[in-house]
Amino acid sequence: MSNPKPEILFFDRKLIEERDYWVDRLAEVSDLSTLRFDHQRGGQFDGRNEVIGLDLSGELCARLLKLTNNGPFLLYTSLMSALKICLHRYTGRETIVVGSPARRQGGESDEFVNALAIVDHLDDGLSFKEFLLKQRETLLAAYSRQRYPFRLLRADLKHPEAESGCPLFDIALTLNDIHHRMFESGHNIEMAFDREADRIKGRVEFNGKVFEPETIIRFTGHFINLLEAAVRNPGARIGSIPMLAEIEKHKVLVEWNDSRAEIPRGTCVHELFEAQAGRTPEALAVKFENQTLTYRELNEKANRLAHHLIKSGVGPETIVALSIDRSTDLIVALMAILKSGAAYLPLDPS
């Protein structure tokens, strides 16, 4: 038969269902989930580029294996979850795509291993444990539809990345326990892990024509910091899991945050806020989970509530009890009380 095998698989109904699944999942993905390039793309990843080792401490390995009950699939799910959260924090994007090889089947040859583009939408309000369970379902769904050829999927999607020969993902993650080595798909970074008894060892292969080693070292350091914090406290919301090292925290919070300014004596907090709202009305003032307010929106909401409080008899020498869960409404209420001339008394909602 003259046609290659992947071409005749269109007659397979299961394969058509797989194609529809992947097209539906990836049709709206327009940007690669990757790091900022140090250099213009100068060649695709070819497996013979630079390599950096990943050092997972004995304590981290023990916590990971305990969290995943020593299961290789759940171990991979945990690594994938941490990687996606790290990329979400780096890029600011809610939709993150990471590459994975097809899951290894018993007796399967490693001559041709399909690539899968694993896409997820991240919500900062989810806990790491909740996202871990979500990621588990995403991976199970993907691996149950892993036969549809990656090269055909790129052609099916017909967006600029596919037409220009760029991949659907730029970072791939593999675990030797459940994967063969993936065929070359054009990605620039591949994170690979092996489990040896009670230790987990990792390495990163990356395109040195695109990334400087320092960039990859910094990113993998953040990945490990985030992974350590997540497995230590799986109930933490993914938007608040720390990933900076202590020296980086000091630089950001102290060295880069030298924002001392002379403020006229007697100036109130809400007056400073109003001045800032006048200077940058459309700038982001408050963000909590999926809620955001610009300075203009926050000022307008606070003014409306302040007028209501004043009409209700609130003013100087008045104390207003405030019992609200953390949200943008909490900031609106704080500003409104101050604008009315009163003081607020915070009460724990629980």
PLM region spans:
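Short amphipathic alpha-helices and their capping loops
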Residues: M1-E50, F169, L175-N176, K249-A261, ...
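Short, highly charged C-terminal tails/helix-capping segments
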Residues: I238-K251
